[in-house]
Design a protein with these regions (language model features):
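Conserved coupling/switch loop of ABC ATPases
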Residues: 166, 184
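Short beta-to-alpha loop/turn elements within the nucleotide-binding domains of ABC transporters
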Residues: 120, 168, 180
Length: 189
């Protein structure tokens, strides 16, 4: 039975090497199409990226993405990076994310050596007006939607299925517990 297990594990290792080359190349092309400046990356799985005209995205060295249930069992939405027309996304060096979503409608800044767990959602916008009259009138504009920048420091760990809301600053070395909702800033720690 052991030879079968070893053969299976060897096939899986070969598959992961081939898949990494394929998905990294695919992601580089998607980044290029969207104008994302990225020094170096490694990807496993298909990330969905959309940088609107006028939006900017810059990613440092050593960016690592795992997305899709074939490559990570945590989180189920896949990796999504969405930057609005006036949005700015800045990601530092050695940042890893698994099946996480980042929406930068105004500004999201992520420092160096940050780990973003599966299912994490980082939103700098409410997406819609919180005023029910405006929201239901059919006249809602981008100016009616509340937005505020998010800043995540260096060496931060964001646990699985956490939500980081608009206006939050997370200090260097902080740990965000799995399943938490951050609506207020978190000190260094």
């Amino acid at each position: 039975m052991r030879p079968v297990i070893y053969a299976f594990k060897a096939c899986k290792a070969i598959h992961l090497k081939i898949a990494t080359v394929f998905w990294t190349t695919y992601t580089r092309i998607i980044f290029w199409i969207n104008g994302v400046k990225c020094d170096s990356l490694k990807a496993l799985g298909r990330a969905r990226v959309n940088v609107s005209l006028g939006g900017k995205a810059t990613i440092g060295n050593g960016f690592y993405i795992r997305t899709g249930q074939s490559y990570t069992e945590v989180g189920n939405l896949g990796t999504r990076i969405l930057v609005g027309p006036q949005g700015i996304l800045t990601i530092g060096n050695n940042v890893g994310m698994s099946n996480a979503t980042i929406v930068a409608d105004q500004s999201v800044t992520i420092g160096d050596n940050v780990m973003i767990g599966g299912g994490v959602q980082i939103f700098d916008t409410n997406f819609h007006s919180t005023d029910p009259i405006i929201r239901t009138s059919g006249t809602e504009t981008r100016d009616d939607v509340k937005k505020a920048p998010i800043a995540i420091g260096n060496n931060v760990f964001i646990g699985t299925n956490s939500l980081i809301c608009k206006g939050v600053t997370i200090g260097d070395g902080a740990i965000i517990a799995a399943g938490s909702v951050s609506v207020k800033s978190v000190p260094s720690g």
